[in-house]
Amino acid sequence: MKEKAVVLDDQMIRRALTRISHEIVEHNKGVDQCVLVGIKTRGIFLAKRLAEKIGQIEGKEIEVGELDITLYRDDLTLQSKDKEPLVKGSDIPVDITKKKVILVDDVLYTGRTVRAAMDALMDLGRPSQIQLAVLVDRGHRELPIRADYVGKNIPTSSEERIEVDLQETDQKDRVSIYEK
């Protein structure tokens, strides 16, 4: 795979997350009834960063949960030998019933991950509303899903791949486009 371009660097990612944080606060008229839920793996780190920024804006903490959607995927990724799904587990520290849940993920592509996340959430409670925040929206939807908060729209071809590197997992913050 050949890197075509770096489309977001660390400063651009920081700015995008700051803007999304302000949009979440403004859209929800505060965050009293909100819970951020990151989709494993990179969505969790982005949710934690958003929570920190929202805390600075509002002067109060917002709960952050972790959602593992492995068993909800219709294109389940299996371990090669055992053919068993690799499940890491979800951790949502509060009851999400009647809360506004803001799902957080790194890239929105076909919409299948978000659909699986909504199915997983509904098994954990009945939120009053589900919103979606993504760092990158690259288009090519297969399902009627749209993000409420987008860091950057990056139109791509189906021959390209978006890769998100985050400090917590990759020792750097950047988003790149690769040719397949």
UniProtKB/Swiss-Prot annotation:
Superkingdom field: Bacteria
Entry-linked SUPFAM superfamilies: PRTase-like (SSF53271)
GO terms (BP aspect): DNA-templated transcription termination
Lineage: Bacteria, Bacillati, Bacillota, Bacilli, Bacillales
Alphabetically ordered keywords of this record: Glycosyltransferase, RNA-binding, Transcription, Transcription regulation, Transcription termination, Transferase
Single annotated GO MF: RNA binding
Gene: pyrR
Residue ranges annotated as motif PRPP-binding: 101-113
Name the record gives this protein: Bifunctional protein PyrR
Chain's role: Regulates transcriptional attenuation of the pyrimidine nucleotide (pyr) operon by binding in a uridine-dependent manner to specific sites on pyr mRNA. This disrupts an antiterminator hairpin in the RNA and favors formation of a downstream transcription terminator, leading to a reduced expression of downstream genes. Also displays a weak uracil phosphoribosyltransferase activity which is not physiologically significant.
